[in-house]
């Protein structure tokens, strides 16, 4: 094969290989996050977040800095329970050092949920900068859930 052709193929394929490697790294980051939560591995779970990360939980009051989220999660992790969300599907977008994702998860108590977030490449390592967990409500019962939510919000 001609050296120019080999060089051209290398130059054309390298970005695809790098993108695939990045995608694999991001999937491993998120899969590891869910595994660490399931196994109640406090240190490795929180090491996956950036130091300035924000976590949004299912309750309207749950907007936490990573330190606030650690305080919330610590008792569950110390009891060895953590929490279990099984990934059903995941999608992500973005290029370069910032990507965003959405994933459908399943939890025994809450049913299907959605996790969305942003990951950022910092010092050669992907970190979660933002994660939001929401409950998925089927349209057929959305009004009923809305009524219950408004009732629960009353002082």
Q: Where do the PLM segments sit?
A:
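A short, structured loop/turn motif at beta-sheet edges
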Residues: 91-98, 119-127
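A short gly/proline-enriched turn/hairpin at secondary-structure junctions
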Residues: 53-64, 75-81
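Short, well-ordered alpha-helical segments enriched in acidic and aromatic residues
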Residues: 39-52, 56
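Short N-terminal segments immediately surrounding and downstream of signal-peptide cleavage
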Residues: 20-37
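Hydrophobic h-region of N-terminal signal peptides that target proteins for export
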Residues: 10-18
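Sec-dependent signal peptide recognition
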Residues: 2-9
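Low-complexity, intrinsically disordered terminal/linker segments enriched in charged
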Residues: 122, 130-155
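Surface-exposed, charged secondary-structure patches
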Residues: 22-25, 68-112
